[in-house]
């Protein structure tokens, strides 16, 4: 069963999200999900099987440029995760369909997502569910710290 998360579901959603993104704790993610519910620019969907949370998906509206798209806003799959014991039964696909329907109801004509370059499972899921690859990029960062003795004002 797929349902749109409400306030009472956010602790479970944050716990599932922390399984997908282990660099974050549920306590860190909970305020983000509360804000998502409040501002209406995104939603979280939960999948339940046999009375237990089996997975979640997070969708948001993106108003900035999204690789490979031509319209705005774009529905964006921020993350989808299904617990191992529930995989292979169409749960992720059902969560995706709920996210797509949510975005379409908000006027989106395109839907997008991303995955890490080395995440073969996610790549296969995206291709299997009708996404086409738009681009591959490598992003770079570096700290902005002045060299010893250097100061610049612009």
Regions found by a protein language model. Name each.
Residues 96, 103-115:
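Conserved GNAT acetyl-CoA-binding A-motif
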Residues 112-122, 141:
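Conserved beta-strand-loop-alpha-helix junction that forms the acyl-donor binding cleft
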Residues 70-84, 138:
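Conserved acetyl-CoA binding element of GNAT-fold acetyltransferases
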Residues 14-28:
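Helix-loop element at the rim of GNAT/NAT acetyltransferase active sites that forms part
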Residues 46, 52-61, 76, 81:
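Conserved beta-strand in the GNAT
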């Amino acid at each position: 069963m797929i349902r749109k998360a409400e306030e009472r579901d956010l602790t479970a959603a944050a716990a599932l999200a922390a399984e997908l993104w282990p660099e974050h704790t549920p306590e860190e993610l909970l305020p983000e999900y509360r804000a998502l519910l409040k501002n209406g620019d995104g939603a979280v969907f939960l999948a339940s099987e046999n009375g237990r949370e089996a997975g979640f998906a997070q969708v948001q509206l993106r108003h900035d440029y999204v690789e490979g798209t031509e319209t705005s806003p774009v529905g964006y799959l921020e993350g989808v995760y299904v617990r191992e014991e529930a995989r292979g039964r169409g749960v992720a696909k059902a969560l995706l369909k709920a996210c797509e329907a949510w975005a379409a109801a908000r006027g989106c004509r395109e839907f997008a997502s991303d995955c890490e370059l080395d995440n073969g499972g996610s790549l296969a899921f995206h291709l299997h569910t009708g996404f086409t690859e738009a681009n591959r990029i490598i992003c770079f960062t570096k700290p902005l710290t002045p060299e010893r003795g250097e100061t610049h004002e612009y």
